[in-house]
Amino acid sequence: MSYHKSSGTILMVPLFMLLISVNYFMSCNAQLSTTFYDTTCPTALSTIRTSIRSSVSSNRRNAALVIRLLFHDCFVQGCDASLLLSGAGSERASPANDGVLGYEVIDAAKAAVERVCPGVVSCADILAVAARDASVAVGGPSWTVRLGRRDSTTSNAAQAATDLPRGNMVLSQLISNFANKGLNTREMVALSGSHTLGQARCIRFRGRIYNSTLRIEPNFNRSLSQACPPTGNDATLRPLDLVTPNSFDNNYYRNLVTSRGLLISDQVLFNADSTDSIVTEYVNNPATFAADFAAAMVKMSEIGVVTGTSGIVRTLCGNPS
């Protein structure tokens, strides 16, 4: 068999494959709709909203947990609820997802929906809607969620290890990591603003204290050092936003400007580099941050969706059936 081809033909192969990939992505997203459950489960959205409001009301930290669940799901294998699957070899069991919590919040929302519309609404859609409702519940922005995602039947722990961003990444690594998912630098900075909510463990921010040349405010450094020594206390929690950790606002960015970002991947966003201007804009214009965050969440929540006759609608989000 001969493999001699003209240079023009060789160039056409990757272009052809790129067009196929783009068309497939557009086709999948085209099957999403805001009216997807209007006839099959008209109370789906209100049922999810009530469940999430109740969960966040009982513990405001749940808002951060739910938003993080969506992020970790979408970055590995797409927004297909693969993260929610339990068992050996699953994304959920990956060390990269160690410390990810809140699965019971989605399970409760799923159970509530199953009571009114059994076997209709996917876990992937419930997670996407729940993240939006969690944001609203703590004073954050709302956004339109297009529906019609299906649930995957597989989950990949190894892919979680390679695809998820890490708390010790430098700026160039973060930009590349998000670009791999079709998200630009501004969207990366906006989505990082979800760290206005939630907490991180000592094992995740220890490098910020002892192994980083990034600027760190002295009193903040002293406080972190006391809570998180060079060894031990791995599970000690500290808020990602030390000012208003349970409310959605722009204080996360204000903290970065004063060198009080908890993770290395936080502080690199404001470190005399290309993203400083975006951080400054979000400090000065909280409405711009809220709008950009909402738009980025919409885009992220449609990464790699499973639609149509592909995938399934799980009865229990943790089981592949």
UniProtKB/Swiss-Prot annotation:
Supply the Pfam families for this chain. Answer: peroxidase (PF00141)
Cofactor(s) needed by this chain: heme b; Ca(2+)
Q: Where do the annotations place Ca(2+) 1 binding?
A: 73, 76, 78, 80, 82
Keywords associated with the record:
Calcium, Disulfide bond, Glycoprotein, Heme, Hydrogen peroxide, Iron, Metal-binding, Oxidoreductase, Peroxidase, Pyrrolidone carboxylic acid, Secreted, Signal
The record describes its post-translational modification as: N-glycosylated.
Q: What is its main location?
A: secreted
Q: Where do the annotations place substrate binding?
A: 165
Q: Where in the cell is it found?
A: Secreted
**Record flagged with keyword Flavoprotein:** no
Record note on cofactor = Binds 1 heme b (iron(II)-protoporphyrin IX) group per subunit.
| Example GO BP | response to oxidative stress
List the Gene Ontology MF annotations in alphabetical order.
Answer: heme binding; lactoperoxidase activity; metal ion binding
Kindly provide the name given to this protein in its UniProt entry.
Answer: Basic peroxidase
**Sugar attachment sites:** 211, 221
PROSITE patterns per UniProt:
PEROXIDASE_1, PEROXIDASE_2, PEROXIDASE_4
Q: Where is the signal peptide?
A: 1-30
Q: Which InterPro entries match?
A: Haem_peroxidase, Haem_peroxidase_sf, Peroxidase_pln, Peroxidases_AS, Peroxidases_heam-ligand_BS, Secretory_peroxidase
Q: Which residues carry this modification: Pyrrolidone carboxylic acid?
A: 31
